[in-house]
């Protein structure tokens, strides 16, 4: 079976994986953990954790469970409390991260529960923050601010050096095909 590694964030990566899982492939998704918007952004600030939202979306896309379970993971609370706009799957990943101390271990646990087709790995266990440098020499910190700015980007980097997980590096080395989404 061909080993396919797909690297990316939540939206594009999730759509691609929904299609790829229909083929006889050994899929590994390596997911960015630099998201800082919405529920993920709040959880990052509150619990000092890496981003979990894109991981949640990838878990749902590779899962082979009842549609109700997918709906549960994607469910967002609509309330006037602190839970407002939090995704249930993000809360679950945050709890597992606090229990295991590792995104990789959290994903391994949820992958078993959700009958995941393939493997999901975080790009890093570090708290990655994106920094964009624009064509007009502006510096924008944070993925959500970069998106909202609508500026022409010269280059992007992390605010500080991050360590790629050993599992992600190993998956890339063993891949027959690498896809960027």
Give the location of each predicted region.
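Active-site glycine-rich loop that binds ribose-phosphate moieties when present
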Residues: 155-169
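Short glycine/serine/threonine-rich phosphate/pyrophosphate-binding segments
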Residues: 12-17
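Extreme N-terminal starter segment of soluble prokaryotic enzymes
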Residues: 1-4
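An anion/phosphate-binding loop that grips the pyrophosphate of nucleotide cofactors and donors
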Residues: 175
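Glycine-rich beta-strand-to-loop/alpha-helix junction loops that act as flexible
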Residues: 8-11, 181
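Short internal beta-strands
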Residues: 28-33
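Electropositive, gly/pro-rich neighborhoods at or near active sites that engage anionic ligands
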Residues: 34-151
């Amino acid at each position: 079976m061909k080993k396919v590694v797909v690297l990316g964030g939540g939206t594009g990566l999730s759509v691609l994986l929904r299609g790829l899982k229909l083929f006889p492939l050994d899929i590994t998704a390596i997911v960015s953990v630099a998201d800082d918007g919405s529920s993920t952004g709040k959880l990052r600030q509150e619990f000092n954790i890496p981003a979990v939202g894109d991981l949640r979306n990838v878990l749902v896309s590779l899962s082979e469970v009842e549609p109700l379970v997918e709906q549960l993971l994607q469910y967002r609370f609509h309330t006037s409390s602190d839970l407002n706009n939090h995704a249930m799957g993000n809360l679950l990943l945050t709890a597992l991260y606090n229990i295991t101390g590792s995104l990789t271990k959290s994903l391994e646990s949820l992958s078993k529960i959700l009958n995941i087709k393939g493997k999901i790995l975080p790009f890093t266990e570090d708290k990655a923050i994106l920094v964009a440098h624009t064509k007009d020499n502006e510096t924008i910190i944070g993925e959500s601010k970069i998106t909202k700015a609508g500026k022409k980007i010269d280059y992007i980097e992390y605010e500080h050096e991050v360590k790629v997980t050993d599992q992600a590096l190993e998956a890339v080395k063993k891949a027959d095909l690498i896809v960027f989404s």
